[in-house]
Amino acid sequence: DEYGLKLIAAQFNHGLRQEQSDEDEIFCRSLAQKFGVDFLTQKMPDPSIPRGMSPEDYYRRERYRFLDRVAADRGANKIAMGHHLQDQAETVLLNILRGSGLDGLKGFLPMRDRKYIRPLIDVTRQDIIASLKEAGVDFREDSTNSSHVYLRNRLRGDLIPLLQKKYNPRIEQNLARMAEIVRRDDDWISGHVDLILTSPRIQYQQNQASFSAEYFKSLHEALGFRLVKALLEGLSPEGRGFSSSHIQAVVDLVISSPSG
């Protein structure tokens, strides 16, 4: 009320830890009731993972579908996520190991699509826990965080502590800072690509887009690559699924073609 906000708590029960998952749901419901916040939850509708999709991607898709539905039903204009600074550092390091481009090195965005916000993205896990203890608020930890089945957990439990001890005690803060720098540079590139996409340089017809090979060759290679990426994703029904090698193959094809 102090800030003129109406809060709704939404929790997606993946059901991966059976009884513990149900206990998490009960805990969240109780905590929401304690603070007078409406609470909505849903269990994973279908545990079977579609072919060609990783478990993590499937769980994420279903989780966001649930959150989007809750926001639409309740007229909420923002969806606040709980990611903190350590989550950001882990994501950036994970994407470095995967050989990601700027999209991956940006990590979690503080705001995405003007709807998803991450108010704790610059706050450390330690500070969050300290604040909860000071306020006398109970909390639960996901028991799978200590499992080494997932690569992210191995980074959290093994690699990051090693980097902190042997190389840089502020590695998490530095990775998060790097994400900020990359976001700034990526925003500049994205802005220029958006201008090109809406300019007469690009001709659209049904599910096709065309442009002059001569014009494309005049672009900086970073802009050219991102332009092809944006066009492919914009024309694709799924809006994704193109690897860097796919995009580069199209770029090479255009560059090798006669000007015109």
Go through each PLM region and give its residues.
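AMP-forming adenylation/ATP pyrophosphatase catalytic core
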Residues: 1, 8, 12, 44, ...
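Core alpha/beta nucleotide-donor-binding catalytic domains of modification enzymes
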Residues: 1-161
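Amphipathic alpha-helical protein-protein interaction surfaces
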Residues: 85, 101, 155, 167, ...
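Non-catalytic, well-ordered alpha-helical scaffold segments
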Residues: 87-91, 153, 157, 172-176, ...
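Contiguous mid-protein beta-loop-alpha structural module that forms a pocket-lining wall or clamp
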Residues: 117-209, 215
